[in-house]
Amino acid sequence: DRLYTVKAIKGKTESNYQLPADAPTGYLNIPLVRPEGGTTPSGQAYTYAPNDASIGDVDGDGEYEIILKWDPSNAHDNAHDGYTGPVIFDCYKLNGQQLWRINMGRNVRAGAHYTQFMVFDLDGDGRAEVVMKTGDGTVDGTGKVIGDANADYRNERGRILTGPEYLTIFNGLTGEAMQTIDYVPERGNLMDWGDGRANRSDRYLACIAYLDGVHPSVVMCRGLGDVYKRQVMCRGYYTRTVLAAYDWDGKNLKNRWVFDSNNPGCRAYAGQGNHNLRVGDVDGDGCDEIVYGQCTINNDGTGLYSTRMGHGDAMHLTHFDPSRPGLQVWSCHENRRDGSTFRDAATGEIIFQIKSNTDVGRCMAADIDPNHPGVEMWSLDSKGVRNVKGEVIASRVRGLSTNMAVWWDGDLLRELLDRNVVSKYNWEKGLCERIAVFE
């Protein structure tokens, strides 16, 4: 029988927590404290439901805590008008103890694209920090208000087109705002991002990347040193694209570099971003690059290459092909032309392509078949599951999802996670079988 073991080191004492692979539930049940709902200025009532989550060891005890985002029931996509309730963040220990609550306030709109939160130990003190974009009226985990508590920049359509934007780093243990600076990439002229109603300008991404090969950075993105860890914040991906890298030394956030597709020589990088990004050392120099959809930004904040294939909804970065050096990228495209592409992550060279006259909205990659070397890949219009040479190894697979992959059952193959269902590809029968359903 397989047995999974997690060990925490407290001082010089080693403690064990064991969950047998055949445990009756196969999961931990963590109670949550649901925020109270409210009413918008238009009279619409809203409630809260748990949304995205991340993990980090915020107290240094060797056990992860969960940072949970609560979204109101009236959260909106950027394309839609309407007021929303405030976004709320909680931190929980695995036993359900709530450590803090952060209320983002009325000047941060609720929706999938607005608030990207990074949880990581950025200064090497053994405890994770939390970094995200904030606004006037954000209340930290100690009850302190950031900026002007009375400011309200929402217009009659519930959109936020004016007002200051901030980047805040929070203490992961207490939720205290340790430093707040002006957010870069700034909003500026809305039309630079593609429209005047913040559908394009308020699409954000973020990641953690080892830009010097040793210490992580935070990178904040908009639009589709020293010995400390760094982060990158991004804005925009349909038109203008800006990425800003930051270092945190335990006292100060310092900007490392800014990449802007509006800068001379960078126009090929505009409009290439996805709704997601990937991080990895694609050129073998020991430092992380940022694969920003159909382009890649080098670790020094310069452009590495652009395929110019434009925005897409999904992609995967890994060492797909064991017979080929380096990393590769599997992508799908919206442009009703390029379909699905498999490319060299270092150069952008297209290794193989399945063209399509449709918007290919999802693609997936995972090692699900032991009969073929490397990682298998498929998309909504890939004509089946492909191996690393582009050959179809299964033309139709019933129940094959295009959402997420997990290691679930203890073998070396991946399982697939879609909503509350874990499924496993049966390569002998050519179908996916459910192995866990969470009610």
Language-model features: where?
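Beta-strand-rich modules
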Residues: D1-G11
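Extracellular fibronectin type III
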Residues: I9-G26
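Surface-exposed loop and turn segments in beta-propeller and other repeat-based domains
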Residues: P31-G43, N103-R109, A177-N199, V258-A270
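Beta-propeller blade termini
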Residues: N51-V58, T115-D123, R127, L205-S217, ...
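Acidic carboxylate motifs that coordinate Ca2+ or other divalent cations, activating on Asp/Glu
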Residues: D61, E65, D125, D285
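Hydrophobic beta-strand segments that make up the repeating blades of beta-propeller
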Residues: I66-W70, V130-T134, V218-M220, Q231-R235, ...
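Short, conserved, GDST-rich strand-edge loop motifs in beta-rich repeat architectures
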Residues: K69-G85, M132-T162, K229-Y237
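Short, small-residue-biased leader/transition segments that mark boundaries at the very start
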Residues: G223-Y228
